[in-house]
Amino acid sequence: MSSHIESSLRIKGLLDSRIGGRPDNQDSAGSADTSLGTIVVVCDGMGGCDGGAVASNIAVTTVIDDVSSAVVGESPAEVLKEAIIHANEMIYKKASETSSLNGMGTTLVAVLITKECVYASYVGDSRIYQLRGKKKVFRTFDHSYVYQALVSKGVITEEQARLSSQSNSILKALGVEKTIDPEVYALPYLKGDRLVLCTDGFWGSMPEHDLITSVCHRFDPENALEQTFTKIENIGIVEGGHHDNYSAAIIDLNTESLIRTKMDKRTKILVAILSFCLLTSLVVNVHQCTHEDQPTQESSSNQADTTKQIQQRLQKSQVL
């Protein structure tokens, strides 16, 4: 069942989770409007029996509760990081206390949207995209074997990784180890940017280019999400109907962050060229002005010399 993302900020968003072709849904997702900003979390659980569902639910609930209890003045980045660390501890503790939940864990993607920027963090192979139209401004890099060991070294392409039989071999997850040290990224944003948080059942269903086209700005978040879910379901049915759970949140940012976005390489080059042209034009104009002034000065000097010569001749004539 889809859920609108409530926020006091100028954003519009929707999140949803579907069972796919599996007997149960181990994904979880949630959001809340807090004093620090809007928190959105999407998780993909794993583990026998109900372990995956339990782990993903603990992660979503813990992170949202911890961020919601924070007060204005606390560092959003630190609050988000500590909330994820706490979620890891809670899942690990629960798995240790209940034998049937041994080995459970979950991936996580979370964003804390503030006026200053978007604070983003992830664990595992669920993803965060920041899109500007169809341009990919930011994307998390999966904590998985195929990405960390193969794609990062140029051994295989991202599309080959998506189709690999080892694509589900993840290197990090909440609840698997006793401690975890998540990274938090500060993402400046422009008005019109779109955030997509999703599990691998969502992004792994089709080539990335097709996915970005499907969730791009031609549609509002609700239509974009529904259209993409329909595509994923149809692809899953064609491929045998045993496709994974898939969950996602799509959020439109309808204002600009207080922290300014950095210029990309292409923009920097363009600015440099324009600056050079402007400077060159200025130098040429100054040179021309200086050159035009010189004949005037020379002419004045010649006129002065002529006047002096006339005066001298007059003096001579008077003497004679």
Write out the residue ranges for each language-model feature.
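PP2C/PPM-type serine/threonine phosphatase catalytic domain
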Residues: 1-320
